[in-house]
Amino acid sequence: MRKTFQTIAILSLGIVAVIAGGQRGLEETASAQAGAAVTQIPRFRAEGSWPKLPSKWVMAIVSSTGIDEQDHLWVLQRPNTLSPEEKPKAAPPVLEFDAEGNFIQAWGGPGAGYDWPETEHGIYIDPKGFVWIGGNGNDDQILKFTKAGKFVMQIGKGGQKKTNADTKNLWEPADVFVYAKTNELFVADVYGNKRIIVFDADTGAF
Protein backbone atom coordinates (compact mmCIF):
# COMPACT_ATOMS: atom_id res chain seq x y z
CA MET A 1 0.00 0.00 0.00
CA ARG A 2 2.84 2.35 0.92
CA LYS A 3 4.46 1.74 -2.47
CA THR A 4 1.13 2.44 -4.14
CA PHE A 5 0.86 5.83 -2.41
CA GLN A 6 4.44 6.61 -3.37
CA THR A 7 3.74 5.70 -6.97
CA ILE A 8 0.60 7.85 -7.03
CA ALA A 9 2.48 10.76 -5.47
CA ILE A 10 5.30 10.49 -8.00
CA LEU A 11 2.82 10.30 -10.90
CA SER A 12 0.89 13.27 -9.54
CA LEU A 13 4.04 15.38 -9.26
CA GLY A 14 5.01 14.35 -12.78
CA ILE A 15 1.63 15.36 -14.16
CA VAL A 16 1.78 18.72 -12.37
CA ALA A 17 5.28 19.30 -13.75
CA VAL A 18 4.15 18.45 -17.29
CA ILE A 19 1.12 20.75 -17.03
CA ALA A 20 3.21 23.56 -15.58
CA GLY A 21 5.85 23.12 -18.26
CA GLY A 22 3.24 23.00 -21.01
CA GLN A 23 1.53 26.12 -19.67
CA ARG A 24 4.85 27.93 -19.48
CA GLY A 25 5.67 26.84 -23.02
CA LEU A 26 2.32 28.11 -24.31
CA GLU A 27 2.82 31.43 -22.53
CA GLU A 28 6.31 31.79 -24.01
CA THR A 29 5.02 30.93 -27.48
CA ALA A 30 2.12 33.37 -27.16
CA SER A 31 4.50 36.04 -25.89
CA ALA A 32 6.89 35.45 -28.78
CA GLN A 33 4.05 35.54 -31.30
CA ALA A 34 2.69 38.74 -29.79
CA GLY A 35 6.12 40.32 -29.92
CA ALA A 36 6.61 39.22 -33.53
CA ALA A 37 3.18 40.54 -34.50
CA VAL A 38 3.91 43.93 -32.98
CA THR A 39 7.23 44.26 -34.79
CA GLN A 40 5.79 43.06 -38.11
CA ILE A 41 2.86 45.48 -38.27
CA PRO A 42 3.91 48.59 -40.23
CA ARG A 43 2.92 52.03 -39.03
CA PHE A 44 1.51 54.47 -41.56
CA ARG A 45 1.17 58.21 -41.38
CA ALA A 46 -1.23 60.17 -43.56
CA GLU A 47 0.45 62.71 -45.82
CA GLY A 48 -1.92 65.66 -45.85
CA SER A 49 -0.32 67.41 -48.81
CA TRP A 50 -0.42 64.37 -51.10
CA PRO A 51 -1.59 64.32 -53.82
CA LYS A 52 -1.31 67.92 -55.00
CA LEU A 53 -4.71 68.87 -56.39
CA PRO A 54 -5.09 72.24 -58.13
CA SER A 55 -6.45 74.74 -55.62
CA LYS A 56 -9.46 75.55 -57.78
CA TRP A 57 -10.81 72.00 -57.34
CA VAL A 58 -12.35 69.93 -54.56
CA MET A 59 -12.16 66.13 -54.54
CA ALA A 60 -15.27 64.16 -53.61
CA ILE A 61 -15.67 60.52 -52.54
CA VAL A 62 -12.97 58.37 -54.14
CA SER A 63 -14.45 55.11 -55.40
CA SER A 64 -11.41 53.51 -57.04
CA THR A 65 -7.72 53.91 -57.83
CA GLY A 66 -5.34 52.33 -60.32
CA ILE A 67 -1.62 52.33 -61.14
CA ASP A 68 -0.29 52.39 -64.71
CA GLU A 69 3.03 51.22 -66.16
CA GLN A 70 4.65 54.57 -65.29
CA ASP A 71 3.68 54.19 -61.62
CA HIS A 72 1.18 57.01 -62.07
CA LEU A 73 -1.82 57.02 -59.77
CA TRP A 74 -5.26 57.19 -61.40
CA VAL A 75 -8.17 58.24 -59.21
CA LEU A 76 -11.87 57.83 -59.96
CA GLN A 77 -14.06 60.04 -57.77
CA ARG A 78 -17.73 60.99 -57.53
CA PRO A 79 -18.28 64.75 -58.04
CA ASN A 80 -22.03 64.37 -57.48
CA THR A 81 -21.46 63.46 -53.84
CA LEU A 82 -20.26 66.97 -53.00
CA SER A 83 -22.51 69.46 -51.25
CA PRO A 84 -24.33 72.09 -53.36
CA GLU A 85 -21.85 74.68 -52.11
CA GLU A 86 -18.84 72.61 -53.19
CA LYS A 87 -20.11 71.27 -56.52
CA PRO A 88 -19.03 74.34 -58.53
CA LYS A 89 -15.44 73.49 -57.51
CA ALA A 90 -15.73 69.75 -58.19
CA ALA A 91 -12.73 68.16 -59.86
CA PRO A 92 -13.42 65.99 -62.94
CA PRO A 93 -14.14 62.31 -62.21
CA VAL A 94 -10.79 61.01 -63.51
CA LEU A 95 -7.53 62.37 -62.07
CA GLU A 96 -3.94 61.38 -62.86
CA PHE A 97 -0.95 62.01 -60.57
CA ASP A 98 2.70 61.01 -60.83
CA ALA A 99 4.49 58.96 -58.17
CA GLU A 100 5.34 62.13 -56.22
CA GLY A 101 1.71 63.20 -56.15
CA ASN A 102 2.05 65.95 -58.74
CA PHE A 103 -1.10 66.59 -60.76
CA ILE A 104 -0.86 65.49 -64.41
CA GLN A 105 -4.32 65.76 -65.93
CA ALA A 106 -8.06 65.30 -65.36
CA TRP A 107 -11.03 64.44 -67.53
CA GLY A 108 -14.29 62.50 -67.57
CA GLY A 109 -18.01 63.01 -67.27
CA PRO A 110 -20.93 62.85 -69.73
CA GLY A 111 -20.07 63.22 -73.41
CA ALA A 112 -21.15 62.35 -76.93
CA GLY A 113 -21.23 58.72 -77.98
CA TYR A 114 -21.19 57.01 -74.59
CA ASP A 115 -23.14 56.61 -71.34
CA TRP A 116 -21.10 58.00 -68.46
CA PRO A 117 -21.91 56.09 -65.23
CA GLU A 118 -24.55 57.51 -62.92
CA THR A 119 -22.33 56.42 -60.01
CA GLU A 120 -18.61 56.12 -60.73
CA HIS A 121 -17.29 52.86 -59.32
CA GLY A 122 -14.16 51.30 -60.84
CA ILE A 123 -11.09 52.36 -62.83
CA TYR A 124 -8.47 50.10 -64.42
CA ILE A 125 -5.50 50.82 -66.69
CA ASP A 126 -4.73 47.89 -68.98
CA PRO A 127 -1.29 46.75 -70.27
CA LYS A 128 -1.75 48.77 -73.47
CA GLY A 129 -2.44 51.94 -71.52
CA PHE A 130 -6.20 52.17 -72.03
CA VAL A 131 -8.40 53.34 -69.17
CA TRP A 132 -11.55 51.38 -68.31
CA ILE A 133 -14.40 52.91 -66.30
CA GLY A 134 -17.41 51.20 -64.68
CA GLY A 135 -20.33 52.27 -62.52
CA ASN A 136 -22.72 50.81 -59.95
CA GLY A 137 -25.75 53.08 -60.22
CA ASN A 138 -28.16 52.22 -63.03
CA ASP A 139 -25.02 51.29 -64.93
CA ASP A 140 -24.89 48.20 -67.10
CA GLN A 141 -21.89 49.20 -69.19
CA ILE A 142 -18.14 49.66 -69.12
CA LEU A 143 -16.26 52.37 -71.00
CA LYS A 144 -12.83 52.36 -72.63
CA PHE A 145 -10.80 55.56 -73.06
CA THR A 146 -7.29 56.56 -74.05
CA LYS A 147 -5.16 58.04 -71.29
CA ALA A 148 -5.92 61.47 -72.72
CA GLY A 149 -9.64 60.86 -72.21
CA LYS A 150 -10.63 60.10 -75.80
CA PHE A 151 -13.58 57.70 -75.95
CA VAL A 152 -12.77 54.36 -77.60
CA MET A 153 -15.53 51.85 -76.90
CA GLN A 154 -18.55 51.00 -74.77
CA ILE A 155 -19.70 47.50 -73.84
CA GLY A 156 -23.30 47.30 -72.66
CA LYS A 157 -25.94 49.97 -72.27
CA GLY A 158 -27.06 51.83 -69.15
CA GLY A 159 -30.44 50.70 -67.80
CA GLN A 160 -30.50 47.53 -69.92
CA LYS A 161 -29.70 44.96 -67.23
CA LYS A 162 -31.19 41.52 -67.86
CA THR A 163 -29.81 38.16 -66.73
CA ASN A 164 -26.62 36.10 -66.66
CA ALA A 165 -27.49 34.86 -70.15
CA ASP A 166 -27.24 38.35 -71.66
CA THR A 167 -23.91 38.72 -73.48
CA LYS A 168 -24.48 42.33 -74.60
CA ASN A 169 -25.18 44.08 -71.29
CA LEU A 170 -23.77 43.93 -67.80
CA TRP A 171 -25.37 44.64 -64.41
CA GLU A 172 -23.36 47.12 -62.36
CA PRO A 173 -19.95 45.60 -63.19
CA ALA A 174 -17.66 45.51 -60.16
CA ASP A 175 -14.20 45.29 -61.73
CA VAL A 176 -12.29 44.48 -64.93
CA PHE A 177 -8.93 43.01 -65.89
CA VAL A 178 -7.18 42.56 -69.25
CA TYR A 179 -5.06 39.44 -69.71
CA ALA A 180 -2.24 40.67 -71.94
CA LYS A 181 -1.31 37.33 -73.55
CA THR A 182 -4.76 36.83 -75.07
CA ASN A 183 -5.98 40.45 -74.97
CA GLU A 184 -9.12 39.26 -73.18
CA LEU A 185 -11.16 41.56 -70.95
CA PHE A 186 -12.42 39.78 -67.84
CA VAL A 187 -15.39 41.50 -66.18
CA ALA A 188 -16.53 40.73 -62.63
CA ASP A 189 -20.24 41.18 -63.30
CA VAL A 190 -21.34 40.28 -59.79
CA TYR A 191 -23.46 43.01 -58.21
CA GLY A 192 -26.60 42.13 -60.14
CA ASN A 193 -25.46 39.12 -62.13
CA LYS A 194 -23.30 36.35 -60.69
CA ARG A 195 -20.67 35.71 -63.32
CA ILE A 196 -17.29 36.44 -64.86
CA ILE A 197 -17.82 37.39 -68.49
CA VAL A 198 -15.03 37.72 -71.07
CA PHE A 199 -14.78 40.05 -74.08
CA ASP A 200 -12.19 40.89 -76.71
CA ALA A 201 -10.44 43.98 -75.33
CA ASP A 202 -10.11 45.54 -78.81
CA THR A 203 -13.49 44.83 -80.38
CA GLY A 204 -15.73 44.25 -77.36
CA ALA A 205 -16.97 40.97 -78.86
CA PHE A 206 -18.17 38.34 -76.41
Q: Model-derived features: where do they sit?
A:
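Eukaryotic scaffold repeat domains enriched in small/polar residues
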Residues: 4-7, 18-206
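Sec-dependent N-terminal signal peptides
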Residues: 7-13
